Every structure is written in C-alpha cells, then in structure tokens.
Amino acid sequence: MTWLLLCLLAQYENGGKVLALSSSAKPYKTSVRFDPKTAHPNLVVSQDKKTVTWVQEAQSVPDNPERFNSTPCLLGSPGFTSGKHYWEVEYGNQRELAAGVARKSVKRKDHLRLT
C-alpha cells in the first residue's frame, strides 16, 4: 500500500494556511484527506482534513507509531496499490515543500531522507 506524503521543509513565518488539496477535472484525480494521526507535532490538520498549517509551537499530541516526529511530514489517505493518481497542492509562503508517495514502512521516528 502506498500513500501521498507531504513534508514542510522550512518554517512558515506568519502562521496561516500552508497546504490545501483540491480535486481536479483531470481523469486521474484522487480525493485525499490528511491523516492527523501521522502529522508531525508542528503540523495542524483542519477539521475537514484538506488543509495543513505549520505552527511555531509543537502541539501536545500522542507519540503514536504512525506519527512523524523528526521531519515535518504527514500522510494523506486513502492509500493505493496501483494505477494513476493526480493531486493539486496549493501553498502559501512556504519556501520548501515536498510532495510524493511513501510506503507504509516509511521511517517516521528518524530524519526522513527525501529522494
């Protein structure tokens, strides 16, 4: 199983909206919701799970096995095993952003090397 992986690689200076996923008319559109159980403590997931915001002060969240705790990343769902998928990512003043795919076994407790 593979999931959409989003990582915020630099601080967002004034808070506010960092990422938002939207559906597209593309034939391979995939509706994605961010998984708050995987979100790094400095990432806040909106109630509708479509927006992520960087916050300066880390949230007090359980350090569950699914949570990224070193690299500011989170996973989107649902996962997939094959096929073509398309996402649109909107972001604000974030200087660095990485979007990709990750396996279930992605390292979450150590620094994540993005390739």
Curated annotation (Swiss-Prot):
Coiled-coil blocks:
none
Signal recorded as keyword: yes
Question: Which Pfam families does the record associate with it?
Answer: PRY
Cross-referenced InterPro entries? B30.2/SPRY, B30.2/SPRY_sf, Butyrophylin_SPRY, ConA-like_dom_sf, PRY, TRIM/RBCC
Q: What PANTHER family does this protein map onto? A: E3 UBIQUITIN-PROTEIN LIGASE TRIM (PTHR24103)
Which protein family is named in the record?
A: Belongs to the ohanin/vespryn family.
Q: What is the protein name for this chain?
A: Vespryn
Please tell me the species this chain comes from.
Pogona barbata (Bearded dragon)
What lineage does the source organism belong to?
A: Eukaryota, Metazoa, Chordata, Craniata, Vertebrata
